[in-house]
């Protein structure tokens, strides 16, 4: 057991999907996995292990934001030996050609995250996805006929910003979407020499105001999940 995850040794697979919402973790496990075992419900942050296409896969809720996500990622890696970490989450679109419900694969993540400012003594670090995971995810989406966009995103520290124009600068420099975890995930993966990828569904749009419901965010977005799972089985022993 670790501080925030109540699993025993061997209960968590080497490849873990990471939704922020613990209820999305439950949905993924119940909808897509077979032989499912609940290994964690500490603080209501559900974690499950099951099989998908014959391979053991885990899914662990992380909560919102880099600080919460970092707790679970550190423990998954250091206490349970996770090797492949795939975030499946939602984001806000900030480009006109990125529509609500589109799937976005995050090649890299700019950020305003305070953790890296402290970690790198004020210098800038460029957190990026593991290319092997990114390439496999893109090819799996192509094979399944699921249109995806690949590019840079922005990881925000605040969900509610004082100034919307703060995001316009990132859009001007090509960021596709805004979310709250990817830069932290990619940084920790690099530190611990494991693999990481972020696959997102656009749940709302900062330019048009279009948005999905909380129920839809919790229990749909199946295209993103299928791409993540098909990628997971390819890198799982």
Curated annotation (Swiss-Prot):
Protein name: Purine nucleoside phosphorylase DeoD-type
Domain of life according to the entry: Bacteria
Keywords: Glycosyltransferase, Transferase
A molecular function (GO) term: purine-nucleoside phosphorylase activity
Species name: Exiguobacterium sp. (strain ATCC BAA-1283 / AT1b)
Record: active site: 204
Function: Catalyzes the reversible phosphorolytic breakdown of the N-glycosidic bond in the beta-(deoxy)ribonucleoside molecules, with the formation of the corresponding free purine bases and pentose-1-phosphate.
GO-annotated cellular components: cytosol
Ligand binding (a purine D-ribonucleoside): 4, 179-181, 203-204
Protein encoded by which gene: deoD
Subunit structure: Homohexamer; trimer of homodimers.
């Amino acid at each position: 057991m670790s501080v925030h995850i109540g699993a025993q040794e061997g209960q968590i697979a080497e490849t873990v999907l990471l939704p922020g919402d613990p209820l999305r973790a439950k949905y993924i496990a119940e909808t897509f996995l077979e032989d499912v075992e609940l290994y964690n419900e500490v603080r209501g942050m559900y974690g499950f292990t099951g099989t998908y296409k014959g391979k053991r896969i885990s899914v662990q809720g992380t909560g919102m934001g880099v600080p919460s996500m970092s707790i679970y990622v550190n423990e998954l890696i250091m206490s349970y030996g996770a090797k492949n970490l795939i975030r499946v989450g939602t984001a806000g679109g900030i480009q006109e050609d990125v529509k609500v419900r589109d799937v976005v694969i995050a090649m890299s993540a700019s950020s305003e995250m305070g953790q890296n400012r402290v970690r790198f003594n004020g210098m800038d670090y460029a957190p990026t996805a593991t290319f092997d995971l990114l390439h496999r995810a893109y090819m799996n989406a192509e094979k399944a006929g699921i249109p995806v966009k690949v590019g840079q995103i922005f990881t925000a520290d605040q969900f509610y910003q004082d100034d919307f124009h703060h995001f316009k600068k990132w859009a001007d420099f090509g960021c596709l979407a805004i979310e709250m975890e990817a830069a932290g995930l990619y940084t920790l993966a690099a530190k611990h020499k494991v693999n990481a990828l972020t696959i997102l569904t656009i749940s709302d749009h900062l330019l048009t105001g279009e948005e999905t419901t909380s129920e839809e965010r919790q229990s749909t977005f199946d295209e993103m999940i299928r791409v993540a799972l098909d990628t997971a089985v390819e890198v799982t022993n």
